[in-house]
């Protein structure tokens, strides 16, 4: 049986480096590839993903990527074999004004300053890999076109509240959070798992918003266990 495709969508300002270790850890089970959608709203991002995706696939994402992945699962339930969400709660933006300001900074020439500001809180101070993860985030962010980041940030700022829609996601789902996530509280992941009929919640200690960089082995272990459960049932 051919290995299923697994689409991975990075967090805001991130690229394939976010998933380098994860892709290596899952290569014997799936065909992973990173996709950065083009769009300034979640529906446009979803349309871009579905246009490029195979007929059937697994999908996952971190933060911005997790929001897009969840929207894809809602938009095309017949095509999605499994969903992985990392650090992306189901609510609307808690501070839309802050989101608007972030896009203004990006479009106003403060790309570097914004990325460095985000880096200050994106990892856990308790993470052994936190300092390295922070520097990787900065390198990714500075290498990403600021307009691309701004468009994705626009999509996040106006995203809808999805708490009432989660029960419609029936595919096997992994909800993985860092306990020290300061962008998306881990309690949101636990609450999502209670609302989704086929979801498991995994919380990682001493990890912030970027588990794939801060705790690559623990993240890979959780992901492989989830994937093997899916593949056994195929």
Predicted segments — roles?
Residues 94-97, 112-167:
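Conserved alpha/beta-hydrolase catalytic His-Asp/Glu region
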Residues 182-188:
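Conserved alpha/beta-hydrolase "acid-adjacent" motif
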Residues 193-209:
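Catalytic histidine neighborhood in serine/cysteine hydrolases
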Residues 207-220:
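Catalytic histidine-centered segment of alpha/beta-hydrolase-like enzymes
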């Amino acid at each position: 049986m051919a290995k299923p495709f697994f689409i991975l969508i990075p967090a805001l300002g991130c690229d394939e480096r976010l998933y380098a270790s994860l892709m290596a850890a899952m290569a014997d089970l799936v065909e992973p590839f990173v996709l950065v959608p083009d769009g300034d709203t979640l529906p446009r991002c979803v349309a871009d993903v579905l246009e490029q995706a195979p007929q059937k696939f697994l999908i996952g994402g971190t933060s911005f990527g997790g929001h897009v992945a969840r929207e894809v699962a809602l938009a095309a339930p017949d095509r999605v074999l499994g969903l992985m969400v990392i650090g992306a709660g189901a609510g609307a933006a808690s501070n839309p004004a802050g989101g608007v300001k972030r896009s203004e900074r990006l479009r106003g020439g403060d790309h570097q300053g914004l990325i460095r500001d985000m880096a200050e809180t994106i990892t856990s101070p308790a993470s052994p890999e936190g300092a390295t993860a922070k520097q990787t985030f900065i390198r990714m962010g500075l290498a990403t076109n600021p307009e691309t980041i701004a468009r994705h940030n626009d999509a996040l700022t106006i995203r809808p509240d999805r708490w009432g829609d989660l029960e419609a996601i029936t595919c096997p789902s992994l909800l993985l959070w860092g306990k020290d996530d300061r962008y998306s509280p881990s309690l949101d992941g636990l609450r999502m798992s209670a609302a989704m009929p086929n979801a498991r919640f995994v919380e990682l200690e001493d990890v912030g918003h970027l588990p794939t960089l801060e705790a690559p082995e623990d993240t890979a272990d959780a992901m492989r266990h989830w994937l093997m459960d899916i593949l056994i049932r195929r």
